[in-house]
Structures are given as structure tokens and as C-alpha cells.
């Protein structure tokens, strides 16, 4: 199939690579020309085969793509995504085309956008994509919401991205997929915090435990075995003291949104809420930053998501609360 992918960040680049490897024809755009040219050079064999097309202009998509146009937006949530979607809506896509937002959008934004595109007869999908930087090799788990006929149409694309161990599920219209992904990330907050706290206790035990050995033991069929536990072991193998991590933990929107929605629905979420609060404190409280627990959460984020290792620029409580 032919698809345009807008955004060559960590996830977008890997998705483009996987689609090319699976034989799809991919048109890529990125705001930075340098990033585009680097990708062109890295994937020159696909350019030669005319399987990869680089475009510097969103407007080119109107004439470059076959009907129905299939455009996957993989940009940071909020303003960057909103701006590109407006460009697409105002002159690029029309009747029968399909637009996909594969970023971590707020499900309420997805619900609104679904209706806006529906009004101009463009099919809209919001797809929550998990798997981090390992999705390229392992396959992506995808949580889909929006137009069901569009989901069925792009099944071949999603099957390619899911190989070998991922998958995709349609959850309903509008923002359903991004709602499921939001809660997934909230659960992720709680699980990461629990693993980090457990490892923190082990690190201070009187038995001089080998943390990698403990983690490997727990991965052999125990109740707490998981991809996150694997990530913890992997991080500890590389840096047993986690000295390279400063204990500053970013808190993206999904954890906050999960807590907010839970309150709206009168659902208690103390574990997720405390994990979120711990992350916020790590951004200004040196006492938290210096703990093995905070360093472990930061290490987990880096290990599975490729998130940057911060050099602390301590923020005030007021800045973090904004």
C-alpha cells in the first residue's frame, strides 16, 4: 500500500522503516530538512527502487498520493499535531481519504477531530501506539479508534507494523483508541513506580544483593515477570548503580489525563496518582532525584522508550505545577 508518514521522530522513523521493510510505498515528510535528507541517505536503496519518496512540502501530498489518500501523522500531541491536521483539512484531503493520528493525543481532542473530518467526508483514525523503540524489532501493539471502515481498509498496514509479536484492536468510534492508550500509559506509570520501589528496597538490603540476578530470577515465570522487568534488568546490566541517571523524571500528559478522567468517573486511582506525583517531585526535589527509585524510573523510560537522560536543571514547585 501507499502511505504518507508525517514526522520522523524516534517512533515515526521506526514506523517508516518497518513499512518499507514490509514492501509498502512510503512518502515521508518532516519539518526539518536535515532529518529528511539523513533518512533519504540511510534508506537510499528504497529511493532507488522508488519505494521511498521524500517530500519537503505538505501540499505535495495532494498530487503525490493515490486516492484514497492515506496519511499517518506521527508528531508530538497538542499544537504540532493540530497545526498539521488543519493544513491537511484545509486543502490536502477530501472525500474518502483517510487521516491517522498515531501520537499520544488526548482522547477528547481525537473525538473532536473525528467529527471535524467526518463533516468533510474524510475518515479519521486515532491510533495509540505502544512498543517504544523496540517496536521496530518486536512489532507494535496498536489501540485503534475512529472510522471502522478505515480501520478495515488499512488492515494490511497494521498487520505489517504488528509483526512479529505486536497486534491491533479496534475499540470503537471517535477517541476510543486514544482513551485505551491513555489508560495504558497510566497503568505503565504505576507499574514502573512499583518496580522501581522494589528495586530500591533491594538495593538497600543488608545482603548485598546482585540486582541483575534478582531481576533475572523474577523473569523466570514469576507473577511480576514482564517487559518492564526485562527493561529494568537491561538497564542494571549496563549501569548497576544507575550513576548516569540524575533522577529527573518527565511526566507526559497521559498519566495526568488518566488521573483527571478517573476523578471525573469517580474511580479511585491512588497508585497512578502517587506515581504521577513522584515524577513531578523529581523535577524540583533533590531529595527525590537522589534516590535509587527515581533513577530506576528514569532508567526504565530510557531503556524502553529511548527518552533522554536529563542533566538536572532544577525547576521550582510552581513551574512543575503549571
Stretch-by-stretch model annotation:
Residues 1-8, 17, 22, 29-31, ...:
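NAD(P)-dependent Rossmann-like dehydrogenase/reductase catalytic/cofactor-binding core
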Residues 26, 54, 99, 124-125, ...:
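Hydrophobic beta-strand scaffold residues
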Residues 28, 73, 99-101:
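Structural beta-sheet core signal
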Residues 90-95, 266:
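Short, conserved loop/helix-junction motifs that constitute active-site signature segments
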Amino acid at each position: 500500500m501507499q502511505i504518507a508518514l508525517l514526522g520522523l521522530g524516534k517512533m515515526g522513523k521506526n514506523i517508516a522503516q518497518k513499512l518499507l521493510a514490509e514492501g509498502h510505498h512510503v512518502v515521508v515528510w518532516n519539518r526539518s530538512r536535515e532529518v529528511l535528507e539523513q533518512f533519504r541517505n540511510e534508506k537510499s536503496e528504497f529511493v532507488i527502487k522508488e519505494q521511498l519518496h521524500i517530500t519537503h512540502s505538505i501540499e505535495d501530498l495532494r498530487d503525490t498520493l493515490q486516492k484514497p489518500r492515506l496519511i499517518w501523522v506521527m508528531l508530538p500531541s497538542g499544537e504540532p499535531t493540530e497545526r498539521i491536521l488543519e493544513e491537511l483539512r484545509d486543502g490536502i484531503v477530501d472525500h474518502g481519504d483517510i487521516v491517522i493520528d498515531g501520537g499520544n493525543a488526548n482522547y477528547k481532542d481525537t473525538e473532536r477531530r473525528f467529527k471535524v473530518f467526518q463533516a468533510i467526508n474524510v475518515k479519521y483514525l486515532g491510533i495509540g501506539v505502544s512498543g517504544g523503540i523496540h517496536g521496530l524489532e518486536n512489532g507494535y501493539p496498536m489501540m485503534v479508534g475512529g472510522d471502522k471502515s478505515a480501520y478495515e481498509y488499512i488492515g494490511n498496514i497494521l498487520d505489517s507494523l504488528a509483526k512479529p509479536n505486536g497486534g491491533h484492536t479496534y475499540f470503537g468510534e471517535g477517541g476510543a483508541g486514544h482513551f485505551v492508550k491513555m489508560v495504558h500509559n497510566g497503568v505503565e506509570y504505576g507499574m514502573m513506580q512499583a518496580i522501581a520501589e522494589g528495586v530500591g528496597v533491594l538495593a538497600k538490603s543488608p545482603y548485598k544483593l546482585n540486582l541483575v540476578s534478582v531481576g533475572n530470577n523474577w523473569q523466570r515465570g514469576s507473577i511480576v515477570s514482564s517487559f518492564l522487568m526485562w527493561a529494568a534488568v537491561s538497564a542494571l546490566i549496563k549501569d548497576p548503580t544507575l550513576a548516569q541517571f540524575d533522577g529527573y523524571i518527565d511526566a507526559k500528559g497521559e498519566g495526568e489525563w488518566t488521573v483527571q478522567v478517573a476523578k471525573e468517573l469517580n474511580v479511585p486511582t491512588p497508585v497512578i496518582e502517587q506515581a504521577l506525583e513522584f515524577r513531578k517531585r523529581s523535577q524540583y526535589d533533590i531529595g527525590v532525584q537522589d534516590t535509587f527509585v527515581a533513577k530506576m524510573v528514569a532508567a526504565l523510560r530510557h531503556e524502553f522508550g529511548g527518552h533522554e537522560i536529563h542533566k538536572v536543571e532544577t525547576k521550582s514547585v510552581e513551574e512543575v505545577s503549571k
